[in-house]
């Protein structure tokens, strides 16, 4: 059964309601940050205090940590905890290769979700990513798989990921376009129909627009929850519980 992070659903709902009733100015729902922009181990200033302060004060309810592989940074555990303690929900995106080895540097928190990139179960890294997912689940973390749609997508590759998510008891599935090409974005829309949970389908669109943004600081500024894509929701949505 899929778990939905209660803190995440609550923060997104509050932000949407505030914007609908104009009690809060329009702003980003999701803010992306590359830890390489903030963490500089070995230098005279290992942490950019100015950028860290701006990040902690950011009004977006969700912070997506991605870009360069976060687990390559020695201070990533403290970095994640600082952001989560500031009141943000945090998604830490990783290829999962080093997740099992470094899982002890993190603490399960209601505000933290570990997002493991997994486009195919046949890739060379999939075995290590699977072990990382298992270690995270056994340690009590919220986990999601992030699958990216590329131009050369094999339409069958995601059909094997779907039963894998159920079998491994992963909490969610995000599917996003890897580029802004019209054909790729269209394929991502079609692929998202494989996601049983309507919440994760909608959140996939939040993440996709944020990651595809060309601005130096990538943000998703559209707080609208439903689009025409949601017309295709499946009638038999899987069991979901808030945790």
Regions inferred by a protein language model and the residue ranges of each:
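N-terminal pre-core extensions flanking Radical SAM catalytic domains
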Residues: 1-45, 215, 220-223, 227, ...
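Hydrophobic, Leu/Ile/Phe/Ala-enriched alpha-helical segments that form helix-helix packing faces
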Residues: 21, 133-137, 165, 187-199
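Short secondary-structure boundary/capping segments
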Residues: 22-24, 106, 232
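Short beta-strand segments
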Residues: 32-34, 64, 147, 176-177, ...
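Short, polar loop/linker segments at the starts of domains and inter-domain junctions
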Residues: 45-46, 124-125, 185-186
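Radical SAM/AdoMet-radical enzyme domain recognition
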Residues: 49-65, 73-177
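A C-terminal junction/extension of Radical SAM enzymes
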Residues: 178-243
